C-alpha cells in the first residue's frame, strides 16, 4: 500500500510540475520591438482608436519584492519622485507640460508600483503636433 501511495504521489508531482510550464506568449506581428543602447526594450503598435491620440506605458521590472525590510515603501517613494522634476522638466514641469497639451494629471498621467513592477502611463496624448 505504501508503494502505491508513493508511486501515485510521484506521478501527481510530475503532472503538476509539467502543467506549470506555459509556452511563451506569441508577440503580435503588428508590434515593432526595439532596444536602446541603455538596455531599454520598447514595443510600438499603431492603434486607430482613439483617433489623434496615443497612449504610452513605461513598465520597469522593479517593485517592492526587491526591497529589504529596512526599505519598505522605497519603490513606491521612487515612483512618486519621478514626477518631481528632471533636468529638462524641473519641479512640476512635466506635469505642467502634459496639462498644457490636454493630458490630465491623475486621470491620464499616472503610475503604480506593485510587487514586481513599476508602471508609468501617459494616456490620451494628442499626436497632431
For the regions a language model picked out, list residue spans one by one:
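His/Glu-rich zincin catalytic helix
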Residues: 5-7, 19-96, 121-124
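Acidic/histidine-enriched segments that form metal/cofactor-coordinating
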Residues: 86-87, 91-129
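N-terminal targeting leader peptides, primarily classical Sec-type signal peptides for secretion
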Residues: 4-5, 13
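Hydrophobic h-region of N-terminal signal peptides that target proteins for export
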Residues: 10-18
